[in-house]
Amino acid sequence: RWGLSFLANCREAAWRENTRAILALALDSLAELRRIVDVENLSYDRNQTGLLKIFRSSGSMEATLRAAKLYEELGVSVKRLTTKETIEKEPALSAISDKISGAVFYPGDESGDAFKFTQEISAAAIKRGVEFKFNCDMNELIRNGDKIEAVKTNCGLISGDAFILSLGSYSSILAKTANVMLPIYP
């Protein structure tokens, strides 16, 4: 069943629709990240100089640029860079310039130290009343109608107003305990 669904989503129209949805979510997430960073004054070696995606072959760069056209339609700034422009943007690549066919630059993207970010965001969350539970195995989602009202763990029952299920391919296993089927597979 999953395989057929996957193949159905390989069509051009489905790809465009899915890319739009994923990009909209990514842009919303980036806006929320920026808001939280500003409100909480988080310090995590934030780098707002964009993202440089480097290519060794023109074929793979062309494939990325085809997708980038859709990104541009949705408001994402994308710049195609020649090998020379790539080296100007990142001089450390000059030693391997003969192996680079160019790059795609996303000036609106940003990065930072993930460890520092998680430490900072955790501290900010604790100040707002969040309680973290570590070394607890989640065994079951307790459902009441359309709402998850608790999680059964080896540390006891954890109740809450809202839950975020973020376990990657393991999400579907835990979701199944509440009769929720997620099309996520390893």
Name each model feature, range by range:
Residues S77, E131, M181:
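Residue-level detector of anion-binding/catalytic polar loops
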Residues L30, A125, S171:
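Short amphipathic alpha-helical/adjacent loop interface patches that line ligand
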Residues S43-Y44, A68, A92-S97, M181-L182:
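Short secondary-structure boundary/capping segments
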Residues R143, E149-P186:
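Central helical "cap/lid" subdomain
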Residues R1-K84:
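Dinucleotide-binding Rossmann-like beta1-alpha1 core, especially the glycine-rich loop
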Residues R35, E62-L74, T86, S94-A162:
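Helical element adjacent to the flavin cofactor pocket in flavoenzyme catalytic cores
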Residues R46-N47, K133, I184-P186:
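A short coil-to-beta-strand element that immediately follows conserved catalytic motifs
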